[in-house]
A protein has these predicted regions:
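Terminal leader/tail segments of proteins
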Residues: 3-208
Length: 208
């Protein structure tokens, strides 16, 4: 997400993976103490409170800082009701310590007729200045629900003009699974069943 914006365990008995993820988030306040640990983890080691990833899962505490970009072959879909706003097998995800991945979609795979430039901007130390987008699919209008980097820093040139969206406010899917939003309301990470935390944005995580 725009970094400065203010706006499990593989158990096969778990039938609803997103419900299990929600339970992870609720546990964060019990597992982490920001005053003890602070922000000193950058992907080289996991903090004591990090959940152990199961088979086929990733820990967000193994992601680097500064973040890196990774290509995604799974289908990514963003929709408003019955209208598919974006659909692609060529997305990228940005991986940063403690946060679930943020997915960016090529502009050519987003329906421009529903996009309107919104006011304001924010700045990320890694990616540059984010511009915001409103989605209008009458009668639904979602203000500042997406963002893009139109002139990113050189390391993020590959996502120039690509769009990401807040899954807390618009329906997002990866590989056929509905995405869950990063906790806290400040961030735009996409939580899928193959990613474990705890995640930045939950209670007790402001020092991460």
């Amino acid at each position: 997400m725009p970094c400065s914006q203010l706006l499990g365990d593989g158990n096969t008995e778990v039938l609803d993976p997103l419900a299990w993820i929600h339970a992870q988030q609720n546990r964060v306040g019990l597992m982490a103490n920001e005053n003890v640990y602070g922000w000193r983890y950058y992907g080289q080691e996991r903090p004591p409170f990090a959940l152990e990833p199961g088979q086929g899962q990733e820990s967000v505490w193994d992601y680097p800082r500064p973040p890196r970009i990774e290509r995604v072959s799974r289908e990514v879909i963003v929709r408003v009701g019955e209208v598919v706003l974006a659909q692609t097998h060529q997305a990228c995800r940005v991986l940063e310590t403690a946060s679930p991945p943020t997915f960016y979609i090529p502009r050519m795979h987003v329906k421009d007729e529903y996009l309107y430039r919104a006011g304001g901007s924010s700045r990320c130390e890694w990616k540059g200045t984010a511009r915001y987008w409103t989605v209008s699919v009458p009668p639904v209008v979602l203000e500042r629900v997406g963002w893009s980097y139109e002139d990113p820093h050189p390391e993020f040139e590959s996502i120039r003009g690509w769009l990401s969206f807040y899954p807390a406010r618009i329906e997002c899917h990866v590989g056929g699974t509905r995405v869950m939003a990063q906790p806290g309301g400040f961030y735009g990470g996409w939580i899928t069943p193959d990613v474990v935390g705890p995640f930045k944005g939950a209670p007790g995580s402001s020092g991460w």
